[in-house]
Amino acid sequence: MAETEKIEVRDVTRIERIGAHSHIRGLGLDDVLEARLVSQGMVGQKDARRAAGVVVQMVREGKIAGRCILLAGEPSTGKTAIAVGMAQALGTETPFTSMSGSEIYSLEMSKTEALSQALRKSIGVRIKEETEIIEGEVVEIQIERPASGTGQKVGKVTLKTTEMETNYDLGNKIIECFMKEKIQAGDVITIDKASGKVNKLGRSFTRARDYDATGAQTRFVQCPEGELQKRKEVVHTVTLHEIDVINSRTHGFLALFSGDTGEIKQEVRDQINNKVLEWREEGKAEINPGVLFIDEVHMLDIECFSFLNRALESDMAPVVVMATNRGITRIRGTNYRSPHGIPIDLLDRMIIIRTVPYSEKEVKEILKIRCEEEDCIMHPDALTILTRIATDTSLRYAIQLITTANLVCRRRKATEVNTEDVKKVYSLFLDENRSSKILKEYQDDYMFSEITEEVERDPAAGGGAKRRVEGGGGDAQPMEH
């Protein structure tokens, strides 16, 4: 008797990973820029969201560039969330570059070069180009291959619209494109005459009954109308940084894919700026200033702030949004203290948006949205306990407990997370306050812990000087009497 084969079916892991802000779809504003309480994944912070909505409107108009906005507030008040909401509201057409303040420190590249590249990544250029295309439905296609298998292929294709039908002779390059796209009779295609690119739009509705079953990717379209040969305006959107890389002699086009751009000369950038301004005067191109978001801006030093002072006054500058959670602190690279760790002359160029701590009701709404995002069904009582944990500790800690509580729930073959699951993970994973309390209680058992009490040195060891161990290094230093 033949053995029956067992087929094991496994779920393919999703490519879309759930991130800290993947639930945000926009700023949650209505047509008159009034913030809704809960909308598009955003909760609370009505004033900050409305101010961010005004900035988004300013960026969309594209008339004002070089403005600087600072998002200032305590930790876990949604500064990065507002920046992500701005990126979602602007859409894919507007360049949005996100970076951290510590990303600019590298051995391969200077700090000013890293900032220059980030600024130029945030400025888009829409280049308009008129191309001649052939658009029609394939009636018949004939390709003659040499008997030897090598040599030039020749062929003919018959294309039609609702008004006319024409035969075209095909060259070797176009035939390769046809074979690659798997073009057959009944397909609606476009051929770019300048580049020879073949694009398959779909199947004609007249051929809908050719097959009893078709795949989900099969798309049915109408047969094109009018002339076969048409002129079409194509808009290419590129960033200034991409143009810089392509025109850089040392790296060239391949650096776009490898990412190894290195230093780009200022002369190259100046020439590109002049050319882009020429195209704008001739109507061939439009400059689209985007947004550069710098998180943890207090990590920049005085040289970077000095560079930004000058860069923001340029015509080719994007809108720069910065975020920080520091109060009055030292400016990196100096001994001077200032608000948010930013020099006063740069603060004078900024408009500041303040974020306030979330209320308990708003925290509960955020946790509910995160549960939906992470496919976690949570009992209302468990959600109440998690909200209490978030208000007592931090919102980030409570969000991290959602997935762990869901795993504990699945381990006991249940579908809904209850209060016992939340209590279990709360006891397993410590928050900052409980961890600090344990460290203070058992600090003598840890290595290199700070000993504040002074210990009398043994006279037999030589000398009667008092010594103490400093935290971090463990070096004993003599104390002066």
UniProtKB/Swiss-Prot annotation:
Disruption phenotype: Death at first larval instar. It is an enzyme of class 3 (hydrolase). Keywords: ATP-binding, Chromatin regulator, DNA damage, DNA repair, Helicase, Hydrolase, Nucleotide-binding, Nucleus, Repressor, Transcription, Transcription regulation. Residues 453-481 are annotated as: Disordered. InterPro entries: AAA+_ATPase, P-loop_NTPase, RuvB-like, RuvB-like_C, RuvBL1/2_DNA/RNA_bd_dom, TIP49_P-loop. One of its GO terms (biological process) is box C/D snoRNP assembly. It catalyses: ATP + H2O = ADP + phosphate + H(+). It comes from the Eukaryota. One of its GO terms (cellular component) is Swr1 complex. It is found in: Nucleus. Transmembrane segments: none annotated. Higher expression occurs in primordia of mesoderm, anterior and posterior midgut and cephalic furrow early in gastrulation, as well as in endoderm and mesoderm lineages during germ band extension. Later in development expression is only maintained in endoderm cells. Expressed in thoracic and abdominal segment neural precursors of all embryonic chordotonal organs. One of its GO terms (molecular function) is transcription corepressor activity. Its EC number is 3.6.4.12. Coiled coil: none annotated. Belongs to the RuvB family. Forms homohexameric rings. May form a dodecamer with rept made of two stacked hexameric rings. Component of the chromatin remodeling Ino80 complex. Interacts with Myc and pont. Acts as a transcriptional coactivator in Wg signaling caused by altered arm signaling. Pont and rept interfere antagonistically with nuclear arm signaling function, and are required to enhance or reduce arm activity, respectively. Also an essential cofactor for the normal function of Myc; required for cellular proliferation and growth. Proposed core component of the chromatin remodeling Ino80 complex which is involved in transcriptional regulation, DNA replication and probably DNA repair. This is RuvB-like helicase 2. It comes from Drosophila melanogaster (Fruit fly).
